[in-house]
Amino acid sequence: MRVKKGFKARRRRNRVLKLAKGFRGRRKNCYRRANQAVERALNYSTRDRRLKRREFRALWIVRINAAARQNGTTYSKLVAALRKAGIEIDRKILADLALALPGDFAAIVKTAQA
């Protein structure tokens, strides 16, 4: 009697089809196309996790620079002054302060320049 590898193969296919949920067209229910689409999506997600960090850092720097210019300095001068004054605040927190609490950000700028 022929034994098919039914359970294992079905489980493998269902795992891929579950990952392809939400895809459009045949990519969501045709195993072969879904497998290719899932593989590509996983590659993109790996790449984009690194890109996300890069893009957020750039966004923080842009926000800090804009707020620093409103307070009469530039980003590079502000970072140098913060380092010289021994104030250790990371860019994410500085950007959040600049956006949410401009008065506190201005106080930090004054402290760094003093």
Curated annotation (Swiss-Prot):
Binds directly to 23S ribosomal RNA and is necessary for the in vitro assembly process of the 50S ribosomal subunit. It is not involved in the protein synthesizing functions of that subunit. HAMAP family: Ribosomal_bL20 (MF_00382). It comes from Anaeromyxobacter sp. (strain K). The keyword Protein biosynthesis does not apply. GO terms for biological process: ribosomal large subunit assembly; translation. This is Large ribosomal subunit protein bL20. One of its GO terms (molecular function) is structural constituent of ribosome. The lineage of its organism: Bacteria, Pseudomonadati, Myxococcota, Myxococcia, Myxococcales. InterPro entries: Ribosomal_bL20, Ribosomal_protein_bL20_C. Gene3D superfamilies: 6.10.160.10, Ribosomal protein L20. It holds the Pfam family Ribosomal_L20. Keywords: Ribonucleoprotein, Ribosomal protein, RNA-binding, rRNA-binding. GO terms for cellular component: ribonucleoprotein complex; ribosome. Belongs to the bacterial ribosomal protein bL20 family. NCBIfam families: rplT_bact.
